[in-house]
Amino acid sequence: MNLRLFAAAAALSIASRGSGAPVLAPAAQLASALQHFISVPTGRIALTHARVIDGTGAAPLEDATILIDGPKITAVEGASAAIPPAYRIIDLKGASVLPGIVGMHNHMFYIARPNIDASGHFEDPLVVPQMTFSAPRLYLANGVTTMRTTGSVEPYADLNVKSEIDSGTMVGPHMDVTGPYLEGSGSYFIQMHQITSPDDARRTVAFWADQGATSFKAYMNITRAELKAAIDEAHRRHFKITGHLCSVTYPEAAELGIDDLEHGFFVNTQLDPGKQPDKCSEGQGIPTLV
């Protein structure tokens, strides 16, 4: 997706999400520095002769007409659809239209290992620099109109970026900001708070929920007791919690009430016969931050 089409992409994302809050501020309210990204302002627009992929699994609708009125798609019909007066017509013959992509596992940082040596070895701690300027643009340019940060190393930066995007002063997708990684003792990453007790886990979730985080992610070295406290506090506030886990097995996390698990079986430790309670297995928990 060309970044200059982000206003249209936002409209498609709004349609896919129903009648919730707009992804972006209306074009007329965007900061002047962002106006050059818009090739087609919002208004009454008819997209004709498009192939529509609606994301439901249904076959694509060929030669379709899409009617857009302001921030909402009002109709998706066949080629014979009547186009109301005063609609701007854009011919999309040969092009495909689909709802904005909802990214379920995204980050606003890029991993770097400044202390790596010539043989590829590195010493703790790792440093993870934030990409507050380029990451939102790159996501949007590739069609991601809604993203979940799924673990943050600089949660205030993520929350402030979300605020700038929502107010129309910065380019980027709608953001579900996950709080800081809920990591236990022994983290590789210097930017992570290391939780020391169930009460610490509860207080961490409560604090960041009050700051504006809307979901949470447990990380590799958290204990079962700490994870349970974090889950209970998140659920008390009607938020969900996921995990990139190795100290806690998947069955243990499911029993504790976790809502989601990231990365599949390559970080799952339940089948390791040498697995110790609340500890990552040998060779597991290698820092990937993916």
Task: Show the residue positions of the predicted features.
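Histidine-rich, glycine-flanked metal-binding segment
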Residues: L30-A31, F37-S39, G43, V52, ...
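Metal-associated gating/positioning segment near the N- to mid-region
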Residues: S96-E164, Y188, D199, P251-G257, ...
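Active-site gating loops and adjacent loop-to-helix segments of metal-dependent hydrolytic enzymes
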Residues: Y110-V128, V171, G179, E183-Y188, ...
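Bacterial N-terminal signal peptides that target proteins for export
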Residues: M1-A7
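Bacterial N-terminal signal peptides
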Residues: A7-R17
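Divalent metal-dependent hydrolysis catalytic cores, especially in the metallo-beta-lactamase
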Residues: S134-P155, H174-P180, D210-I222, K240-T242, ...
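Boundary at the C-terminal end of the N-terminal hydrophobic targeting segment
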Residues: G18-G20, A27
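Active-site core of metal-dependent hydrolases
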Residues: A218-V290
